[in-house]
Amino acid sequence: MSEIQVPESHWKHFLEWNRPLPPTKQTCIHHEIEAQAAAQPTKVAVASTVASLTYGDLNGMATRIASDLKRHGICPEKIVPLCFDKSPSMIVAMLAVLKAGGAFVALDPKAPSSRINVIMQQVNAKIVVTESKHRHLFSDYQIIEISTYDFMLPQTTDNYPSTRPSHPNDAAYLIFTSGSTGKPKAVVVEHQSFCSGMARHAPAQFIDRHSRVLQFASYTHDACIVEILTTLCMGGTICSPSEHERVNGLVQFINSQSVNWAVLTPSFITSIDHDEISTLETVVLAGERTLQSNISSWAGSVRLLTGYGVSECSVVTTISSPADENRSASHIGMPAGGVCWIVNPDDPDKLLPIGEVGEIIIEGPTVARGYLGNPEATERAFIQPPVWLHHVLEDPDHSSRLYRTGDLGRYNPDGSLDFVSRIGSQVKILGRRIELGEIEHHISNHPFVRQCMVQLPSMGDYHNQLVAVLELHTKPYVSLGDGSESNDLVQCNADTHKIESFLRTKVPEYMVPSFWFTIDHFPRLPSAKLDRNKVADLIAQLRLIGDASYGVVPEDDVIGRQIAREVTTMRLPQGQVLDPSISFQDTPLRKAGIDSIKAISLRKTLQRLWGVNIPVSCFMEQTARPTSIANHVRSAQDQGQGEYILPEPDLKGALDGLKRSLDVSMTTAPTRSSVSSGGKLSTLLTGGAGYLGQEILKTLLTAGRRVIVLVRACNISEGRKRFHNLPWWRSDFEDKLDVCLGDLSQPNLGIDQDLMERLGGHVQAVIHNGARVHWTECASDLWSVNVDATVTLLQFALSSSSVQRFVYISGGSAIGDSSDEWLVNARDGYSKTKLLAQALVEHCATKSEDLQLGLGMSIVKPGFIIGGPETGVANPSDYLWRYVASVVELGVYDESTTRARVPVSTLPLVAETIIRQISTASNRKHVEIIDESLRERDIWEVLRTLGYTLRPVSHRSWVTTIQDAMNKRREDHYLWPLASILEQQAYCLGDEKIQLGCKLKKKEYLKNAIQRNIQSLVSQGFI
């Protein structure tokens, strides 16, 4: 048990779900189908507009062709390629190969001849089963030809030539998947693997003898195995459209053939109107990430299932129960055939607890044999049982392998799973990990959008920029291609501008694509999935284009034209030649992909060229363009200054105006009763998913309090799952947590006014911890989240007679003696907005007390927050750890500041202080400063204890050393994103003006916490 590092209760659940393993079904696929033919020979097995076959016809025809195959030497472990257009002939050929004892592999007749030849060579093919139109592809091979004419010939039920009978552990079929080297990999699936899975996945998907199953998938895609073989094994009817019907008349075919079961990709189903289909009863969505719009559109019309599977585990791995309209799009249901485990993607020997995201690995009888002739790839993907599994193996001497899917997922408390993403599908922008699927989800919810794709190209003019490509219900406008292809990318237009505006109401600015294109029809793979690689190629081939509406920098604006060139150069891959047509466009910097990191580089370039320092926040303004930045440079030069001084916003005036607005709310505010609610009311928490917010939430729930968390998510189910993922989550917290969908950046927190009023009767305390922390953005960009949201919450608390406590978590620079002094001293947008919001809370606290409203208000102001000594969970993006990492990297520190104090406290201590504010009686101390601190030398001492060699240097030497390091590594340096803060701090970590004390016991506690945090950062590779 020492190898099992999950909570014991989680391990017990895993054993309940995953032990014993599903039994291995020791049979062959064709034996199951032969049994159906014997039981119901006259029932239609395959229905099409070309020809229909009964089970007796199918079995007899396959038997005759199997005899031919055996005479040509086909026997167990021999592989037979099959090459057909959509027709019943392919189904006959599949069964014939199985009856002959061989294994089949499907070929796409439209594939490049080079790929067909590679596959033929890999499987060592000697004979091909095909139709006359494709004979020319296989001139060097023996051919058995099948045509619809053969269906009219008398069928035999004679025994085929005698060979070794098929065994359950013989190969049944091969599926080719893409390989990282460019050479496709062939997955070998045995009879027993498929039959074991089929015994579970057929009933889970409601496939039985009454099913009329649409054969939609390409023969080279594994979904066709379920559509064909599972249906035949269960005695159902395969409804097989021609390729023309599949592409141009699918709805008509479904209705004419009374199809009642189909598996479709989420992107393809958007092209079908469920009102046009009268016979469908069950639809399975699989093969791609399901969209919430898929569920909301179809859940009320059919029995909608969502599934997940891989070719390497007999196609189907999990299946959901029928969905309602509130089902999360990430839900993939329960295992069906094998069992699933969630492990650390970097180390499968580390099992992860329920709710934590990790790699899905699959165990059980459905796991395939491996990759044909590729032992290295097989060994990487099909692994031996991890150490945590050894002591529960049913037969340790004959233990089966597990398959690593390369997909991220998580277990839910009920034993179902969620699909999160493909490993590597997340991208990193401005240090934030972004799931492209989340952006796609929100875009797809716009009524103009049929389907969409968001990419971060790795090459071409648009590299490292978020690009959205949309297929709209409306027609595109100006083509960027030659107009000959329906998948030309098209310039953004009025519709995409509206969609972009819509997206800005759903996600933060950094998740809004910089470039928008439309396409007539997305290219698709044979499996009907969107062809993401093809779209990526289309984007990579596009040259960077400008938008004429932005205009051109005037020729006489030398500075502006130089800035425009610099901006354009930063957009292009290194070495790419500038297109003169876009070199001098006056493109908004944000539209040009200038983020805070690039803004710092641009600032340094301008400082070098013209000797003027432009604040980074100027580059980050929504209205910033080359011409506006050039005006700032000239303004500073005209005044003989080396720095452009931003016009100070009238913060005092804004503060006074907001105070007056809140005063009006206080005059009508009800007086609260001091009687306790007995735990029936909740605490409303903002920022609950953040670094500190998670600790606050854990502390509240552990104390038995009910909590309502404001969350920006696709739906409530997705919002709840964010907390299920946390390592400390317990099932008994479920009933204490409510999720309220909202967004601090939106008016009224993004909450409907009726819901806001209903919330007012259920909340006893408000903890406002949410904020947008960005040190380079201007106050106006942070205002909605940091100021407006605070005002809304204050008004909410004042208007509700049930709210008795309001706690605000402050931040920004050090506190002065008055609100006026705070705002005067604040230099960055974050400090300005946080301190202004704090001043509003203090104003309301004082006035509420004077009016005896019974509403206690307080402010908690922590310094740097670090993980406790027990867990050491550090926040690598914090200035503290970026500074420490720089010291470690350089091996030197500033000896002039060793006595300077660093205000620091741990997550548990800060959370306890905050909870205490809502638990105790109101007092006159409205601002609670968390006064723990360490001297800088204490931190350097901890580093030395851990074995790091550090050398003290003078302040001047330290500044020169760190500046040289930053100029050398630029965007890759730890402190580059916080360069402006580093300069404001005079390249220091602590402050000698801080007089906060620290008792010896607390000092040792904090030093232990520092040590544990550093060790954690080392294990993450940050230090």
Swiss-Prot record:
Pathway the protein takes part in: Secondary metabolite biosynthesis
Co-factor requirement: pantetheine 4'-phosphate
Region (Adenylation): 54-454
Domain Thioester reductase (TE): 685-901
GO molecular function, one term: oxidoreductase activity
Keywords, comma-separated and alphabetical: Ligase, Oxidoreductase, Phosphopantetheine, Phosphoprotein
Keyword Phosphoprotein appears in the UniProt entry: yes
InterPro entries: AA_adenyl_dom (IPR010071), ACP-like_sf (IPR036736), AMP-bd_C_sf (IPR045851), AMP-binding_CS (IPR020845), AMP-dep_synth/lig_dom (IPR000873), ANL_N_sf (IPR042099), Far_NAD-bd (IPR013120), NAD(P)-bd_dom_sf (IPR036291)
Chain coiled-coil ranges: none
Modified residues (O-(pantetheine 4'-phosphoryl)serine): 596
E.C. no: 1.-.-.-, 6.3.2.-
Segments forming domain Carrier: 554-637
UniProt comment concerning the protein's domains: NRP synthetases are composed of discrete domains (adenylation (A), thiolation (T) or peptidyl carrier protein (PCP) and condensation (C) domains) which when grouped together are referred to as a single module. Each module is responsible for the recognition (via the A domain) and incorporation of a single amino acid into the growing peptide product. Thus, an NRP synthetase is generally composed of one or more modules and can terminate in a thioesterase domain (TE) that releases the newly synthesized peptide from the enzyme.
Function: NRPS-like oxidoreductasee; part of the fragmented gene cluster that mediates the biosynthesis of fusarochromene, a tryptophan-derived metabolite closely related to a group of mycotoxins including fusarochromanone. Within the pathway, fscA acts as an oxidoreductase that reduces the carboxyl group of 4-hydroxykyrunenine to primary alcohol. The first step of the pathway is the epimerization of L-tryptophan to D-tryptophan in the presence of the NRPS-like tryptophan epimerase fscC. D-tryptophan is subsequently hydroxylated by the tryptophan 6-hydroxylase fscE to yield 6-hydroxytryptophan.
Family designation: Belongs to the NRP synthetase family.
Name of this chain's protein: NRPS-like oxidoreductase fscA
Native source species: Fusarium equiseti
